[in-house]
């Protein structure tokens, strides 16, 4: 009986994997601008809401993937899934760009604006966890009235890329890596949080664990700045020990 159950589980996972691959072949599109090719999937619905979902970071050796496609399957709204497969290892660049040019970020914003116009959406909801959480904040802060649903985000990007050994992403974003560029990246998101003029109209939903390293290194400083600047934000606090466990929440 145990072997049969294991076989069924493997079969289910294989089936889900094949369905995902088939969907990519059918639904994945490409948006090209400023020399950037941005891959995405768009689910249209009769709704005034648009959910924008960003990729998390994969393990070393595994290319970037779309996130939360199955999770949001039954949600009746427009959904834009964006793939961050930039950098030489195709694990992503936080949707920023190469050599400090930020052309990927500009392309992402172009596509979001275009899809918002096409769908007629008047409420934008930016979602992601870990790397995707950083990105959901980075883009969500640019839009008045936006909602940001964020899990375990990094806050000081330069140091995070150094600490996690994500050197390919760092080299892609910075070009020639130096202390000045690392510090610029460290302050990139904090500056946006502090200087944001849309604070009164925005809402942030933040999930994190207070027992894994991202909290002490990043999230407690993010919460400090959100509080000091008067953001409306809600916290969902867990206590798991490993950052990767965020995928279970």
Model-derived features with residue positions:
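The feature captures the conserved acid-bearing segment of alpha/beta-hydrolase catalytic domains
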Residues: 166-236, 243
């Amino acid at each position: 009986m145990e072997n049969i159950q294991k076989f069924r589980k493997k079969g289910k996972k294989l089936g889900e994997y094949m369905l995902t691959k088939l969907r990519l072949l059918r639904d994945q599109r490409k948006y090209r601008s400023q020399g950037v090719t941005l891959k995405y999937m768009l689910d249209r619905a009769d709704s005034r809401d648009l959910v924008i979902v960003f990729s998390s970071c994969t393990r070393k050796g595994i290319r970037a993937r779309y996130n939360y496609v199955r999770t949001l399957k039954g949600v009746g709204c427009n959904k834009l899934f964006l793939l961050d497969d930039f950098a030489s290892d195709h694990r992503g660049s936080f949707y920023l760009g190469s050599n400090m040019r930020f052309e990927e970020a500009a392309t992402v914003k172009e596509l979001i604006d275009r899809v918002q116009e096409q769908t007629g959406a008047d409420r934008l909801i930016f979602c992601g966890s870990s790397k995707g959480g950083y990105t959901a904040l980075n883009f969500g802060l640019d839009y008045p009235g936006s909602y940001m649903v964020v899990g375990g985000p990094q806050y000081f990007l330069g140091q995070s890329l150094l600490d996690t050994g994500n050197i390919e992403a760092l080299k892609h974003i910075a070009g020639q890596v130096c202390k000045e560029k690392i510090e610029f990246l460290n302050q990139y998101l904090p500056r946006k949080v502090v200087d944001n003029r849309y604070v009164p109209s925005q809402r942030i939903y933040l999930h994190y664990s207070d027992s894994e390293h991202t909290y002490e290194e990043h999230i407690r400083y993010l919460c400090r700045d959100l509080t000091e600047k008067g953001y409306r934000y809600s916290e969902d606090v867990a206590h798991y020990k490993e950052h990767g466990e965020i995928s279970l929440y």
